[in-house]
């Protein structure tokens, strides 16, 4: 059940919130966990047992890692938990990639959210082992942490200690509901009115690589970069908004990544919660940047190899991860020179656009079906095809408005203008205008969805 589906927007969500707000506080966790499991089972009924098994094993191992247990026992339990969670992930996501050349394996449909709830479980077990957080004795609360429906399928990935207080007790006021509803609607509009509108351009171009021209290749790449941003950041906005309406505060997951000042800065702005997870639970345990230059570069490459594999079991994702790993390593090596000789003049003016170009070019590996298709696409981008065709010019004619709107929407311009306007208005007027905007965006998004323009979220496949 996708957040942007009619069944979620007009059936599940209203009914769930009516029940949730009417019941007493002591029953909210029970209803929320039941609603979360129903939400998951609606789309993945055969994989609900896998989620429940992950919850139960994580809870049992966390309980067994009590502080008074010996260090060796706790370490052994942590290893057991990591083997279980990573083994689960390998079995359903990577078995064909790692072992398909040796044995004939059935092709499994990837369970929704498995990459996300597995990482949540690992972070909990590691934090309990480090005694950063006490073991959760209440199975219901731990189950809710792993299965909480706003973040279950596509994140954000939130460390357990950040949600622990709200799992035990939370309050919800009118401001939470208002702000959460507004944030959810902004995310819905990003998804329905921008990401799904760009899907026609992206699908048309990427689905017919034989007809690629230089113009269509660039249109397809720019369109995909914007589609992916609005698709995933829109989901994150909806998740953050839903969490707020339920009494939870989720961290931001995007911060205008296409305004990056470097490749490293791009990844401090894109899928922030995933980058934070890899930094805390892989990069730092490997030694981070405290182990000398060569080991630091090794650590960075290992993290980016893991990041690529996390996204998917194919050589495209492996190379995509290594592509960004190499770029970040180069930045690490060249940083002392840049500090000694600050960028000035033409170099300073070119650095940002070059970094943006390199970041966007990485999406070719991310989107292409396989490596030969990626190679073909790269060749067409840089002159390995006719400059344009009638079809390419038609794409430009039909989609330039949404491309322009997307380019503006990928900057903080609209948010800044709205903030300045809101600061000049009385609170009552501001609230009324916000309500009108919510209703207008909801109506426009609903019309678009009812016209049959619904597209699945891109990150559902991860």
Task: Put a short name on every predicted segment.
Residues 1-461:
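Membrane-embedded transmembrane alpha-helical bundles that form the catalytic cores
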């Amino acid at each position: 059940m996708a957040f942007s589906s009619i069944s979620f927007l007009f059936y599940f969500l209203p009914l769930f919130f009516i029940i949730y707000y009417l019941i007493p506080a002591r029953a909210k966790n029970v209803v929320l966990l039941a609603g979360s499991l129903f939400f998951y089972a609606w789309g993945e009924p055969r994989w609900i047992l896998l989620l429940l098994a992950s919850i139960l094993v994580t809870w049992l191992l966390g309980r067994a890692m009590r502080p008074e247990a010996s260090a060796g026992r706790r370490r052994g339990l942590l290893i057991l938990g990591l083997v279980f969670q990573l083994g689960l992930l390998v079995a359903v996501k990577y078995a064909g990639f790692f072992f398909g050349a040796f044995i004939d394996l059935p092709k499994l449909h990837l369970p929704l959210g498995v990459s996300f709830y597995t990482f949540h479980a690992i972070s909990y077990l590691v934090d309990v082992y480090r005694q950063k957080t006490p073991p959760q004795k209440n199975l219901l609360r731990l189950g809710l942490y792993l299965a909480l429906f706003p973040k279950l399928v596509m994140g954000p990935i939130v460390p357990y200690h950040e949600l622990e207080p709200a799992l035990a007790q939370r309050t919800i006021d009118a401001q939470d509901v208002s702000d959460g509803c507004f944030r959810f609607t902004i995310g819905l509009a990003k998804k329905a009115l921008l990401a799904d509108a760009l899907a026609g351009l992206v699908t048309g171009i990427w689905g017919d690589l034989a007809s690629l021209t230089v113009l269509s290749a660039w249109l397809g790449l720019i369109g995909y970069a914007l589609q992916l941003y609005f698709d995933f950041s829109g989901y994150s906005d909806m998740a953050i908004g839903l969490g707020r309406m339920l009494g939870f505060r989720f961290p931001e997951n995007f911060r205008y990544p296409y305004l990056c000042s470097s490749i490293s800065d791009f990844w401090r702005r894109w899928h922030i919660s995933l980058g934070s997870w890899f930094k805390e639970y892989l990069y730092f345990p490997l030694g981070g940047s405290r182990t000398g230059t060569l080991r630091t570069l090794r650590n960075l490459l290992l993290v980016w190899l893991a990041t690529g594999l996390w996204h998917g079991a194919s050589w495209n994702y492996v190379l995509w991860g290594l592509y960004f790993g190499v770029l970040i390593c180069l930045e690490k090596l060249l940083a002392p020179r840049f500090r000694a000789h600050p960028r000035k003049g033409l170099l300073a003016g070119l650095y940002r656009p070059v970094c943006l170009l390199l970041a966007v070019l990485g999406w070719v590996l991310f989107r292409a079906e396989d490596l030969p298709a990626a190679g073909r696409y790269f060749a067409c981008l840089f002159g390995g095809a006719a400059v344009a065709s009638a079809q390419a010019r038609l794409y430009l004619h039909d989609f330039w408005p949404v491309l322009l709107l997307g380019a503006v929407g990928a900057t903080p311009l609209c948010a800044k203008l709205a903030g300045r306007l809101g600061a000049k208005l009385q609170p009552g007027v501001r609230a009324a205008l916000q309500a009108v905007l919510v209703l207008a965006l909801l109506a426009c998004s609903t019309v678009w969805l009812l016209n049959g323009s619904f597209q699945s979220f891109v990150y559902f496949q991860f």
